[in-house]
Amino acid sequence: MIGYLDTSAFVPLLVRESASDSCRRFWDDSDVVVSSRLLYVETAAALAQACRMGRLTEDELNASLRLLDELWLDIDVVEVDDIVVERAAVLARRLELRGYDAVHCASAERLNEDDLVAATGDQKLIDAWGKLGVATFNTNNP
């Protein structure tokens, strides 16, 4: 299986959340893990925000960022090139997606692989991928 992760499916690998176990199983079951280059900055921003909100200590933030760097090496990256950006713009309008979600949607769609499964905890993104024929894994309902 080629496993595509959006940020909501990746952050629980770095910090303990209710979806951490299902995200870990998805990661472990994937022969190849893929995501948009956007995942890196989106994850770093989410972790920093969690620290600002008091959900993570500074030490936990630093440990999570080190783990981000470690796991990032195991991810095959889909570049955010003109093709992905233009498709994401169309999908944002057509499927009523936020910008980052539209980029994840377009990135997974671009892979066009039969054994691709895209993981997220975002129901709107699950619905969007479903409309495009992309198999999904809901990290909130494994």
Located regions from the model:
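Short beta-strand scaffold positions
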Residues: S35, E79, G99-A102, A119-T120
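Short active-site oxyanion
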Residues: M1, S30-V33, D74-D76, N112-V117
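Alpha-helix capping/helix-boundary segments
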Residues: A9-F10, L39, V84, H104, ...
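Short, well-structured N-terminal submotif of metal-dependent ribonuclease cores
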Residues: M1-L39, A50-A63, P142
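Acidic catalytic patch
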Residues: R66-L95, A102-A106, L111
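Short glycine/serine- and small hydrophobic-enriched flexible loop segments
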Residues: A45-R52, E109
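Alpha-helical elements of the RecA-like P-loop NTPase motor core of helicases
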Residues: D21, E86, I126-D127
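Acidic, PIN/NYN-like endoribonuclease modules and their adjacent C-terminal/linker elements
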Residues: I2, C105-A106, R110-P142
